[in-house]
Amino acid sequence: MAGRFENLPGGGAAVALDDVEISILRSLAVQLMELIGPGEEPAKDADPLAALFAEGPSKPPSDPALKRLFPDAYGDDSEELRAAASDFRRYTENDLRARKREDALVVVRALDALSADAAGEGGAVLKLTPDESRAWLGALNDLRLTIGTRLEVTDEEGEQLYRLPDSDPRKPMVMAYLWLGALQESLVETLMS
């Protein structure tokens, strides 16, 4: 099970993680939540229906990683499609941000509980329910997209990542990117089996 998710009876998934892996995953999930931002909290006396239909931003984010996490709905440069993308963003981005934040928070909470349970043991087996597994899958995907954007990874140079010299300053993030990819792939395989 080391480093690969496996099925749990009744659904869900499990993976063995050591203390370093737990620390890295937690740190990355917290950084992702910080990147996504805190979100808008409705006023205590606000109309719940109005809060449900609150409008979000209409312009794409300037940060390339956020732009990757929250892309335009339509990729064409025509004025009509830019306006449609703006409207789509206005009505969907807040909910999408909230879901991505919640997925990352599920990761942090699971790792915090795991760390508390395994104190002093050097690692533990993380067991996820089916719902937690889906949240983890979303968070792992968001982490890979973010790191891949920061590293400027393209399909064409994917193989080159495996051959970076140890002296390359990108090497630690590339290793995290590749490891997250392997975790994500094993979780997908587990959930589909």
Q: What does each of the following model-derived ranges do?
A:
Residues 1-110, 114-126, 132-193:
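Charged, alpha-helix-forming regions
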